[in-house]
A protein has these predicted regions:
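N-terminal active-site segment of His-dependent metallophosphoesterases
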Residues: 1-84, 89
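Sec/Tat-exported extracytoplasmic proteins
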Residues: 34-37, 56-60, 94-98, 194-201, ...
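Active-site-proximal segments of metal-dependent phosphoesterases and phosphodiesterases across multiple
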Residues: 201-247
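Extended active-site neighborhood of metal-dependent phosphoesterases/phosphodiesterases
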Residues: 2-19, 85-202, 232-235
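Active-site neighborhood of phospho(di)ester-bond hydrolases with catalytic His/Asp-centered motifs
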Residues: 29-31, 64-69, 101-107, 207-210, ...
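Short, flexible/disordered intra-domain loops and linkers
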Residues: 39-44, 75-83, 113-116, 175-179, ...
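Active-site-proximal beta-strand elements of phosphoester/diester hydrolases
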Residues: 25-37, 158-171, 209
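Active-site environment of divalent metal-dependent phosphoester hydrolases
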Residues: 36-39, 72-75, 103-115, 169-172, ...
Length: 247
């Protein structure tokens, strides 16, 4: 776990991180690295690691957030199911930048038959020298639902960063069942926490980090295809335009 005079873990679901409110705080979000660290994925891993290294050196962020599918224990793509080894290698890579980082799980971090489940991966990531992570409440759906409250030196919360586990696959199991989502109990927990913060600052805003796109993404895509000018396309493509996109 990251050790700093500016960071304090107040309970099993909350960190406070003191920042200079007079300076910009830069957060770099990275997603879907799909690092396999196996013989099949060796070439793609090298490309991904080189790209991430260039991005981090150019961006010079104050914090990095990995929003899921960081590792990929999928035999046909990686040549290994050993996500324990993958997690340790990812952690070593991220620690090498000496920048605080945190993460949420995606649907690929713990594939069927992989060595570790999410609870076990959580214990690994908590060993990271620069990693900020906790499992969160056991009674909540998912693993890794927690807050990092960016706070001023006078202990006022400036910006809550909400980490949410958007879970893995649907009720049918793996792949063909579609994807899971952020569950109602997670939303209720999140809003309760935010409402508590609003008692001190009614105008407070928050940022949430998660892997699965919610239904609003599908609605925006539908409007864009219909030529709705209220939707602005910026960059990128959508590979999954079916019922698996936006839930």
């Amino acid at each position: 776990m990251y050790k700093s005079d500016n960071l304090k873990q107040t309970d099993n679901e909350t960190f406070t991180y003191i920042i200079d409110k007079h300076k910009d705080f830069k957060i770099l979000q990275l997603t879907d690295l799909h690092l396999g660290f196996g013989f099949i994925s060796r070439k793609k891993d090298k490309l991904a690691l080189n790209a991430v290294t260039k991005i981090i050196h150019k961006a010079k962020p104050d914090m990095i957030v990995l929003t899921g599918d960081s590792i990929f224990p999928f035999l046909p793509k990686a040549g290994t199911l050993n996500n324990r080894k993958q997690a340790y290698k990812l952690m070593k890579f991220m620690d090498s930048f000496a920048i605080p980082y945190t993460l949420v799980f995606g649907n690929h971090d713990c594939e069927m038959g992989s060595t570790c489940n999410k609870e076990e991966l959580a214990q690994i990531y908590k060993k990271g020298k620069y990693c900020i992570f906790t499992e969160g409440r056991k009674e909540l759906t998912g693993v890794g639902n927690f807050f990092i409250n960016l706070t001023s030196s006078d202990e006022n919360v400036l910006l809550p960063l909400v980490m949410l586990d958007s879970n893995m696959y649907g009720e049918g199991g793996w792949f063909y069942s579609g994807f899971d989502r952020i569950h109602d109990d997670q939303v209720d927990w999140c809003m309760t926490r935010l409402n508590d913060l609003k008692k001190c600052n009614p105008d407070i805003k928050a940022m949430a980090f998660f892997h699965m796109p919610p239904a609003e993404f599908k609605e925006a895509y539908r409007k864009m295809k219909l030529g709705d000018k209220s939707v602005l396309y910026q960059h990128g493509s959508i590979a999954e335009k079916n019922e698996h996109f936006g839930i």
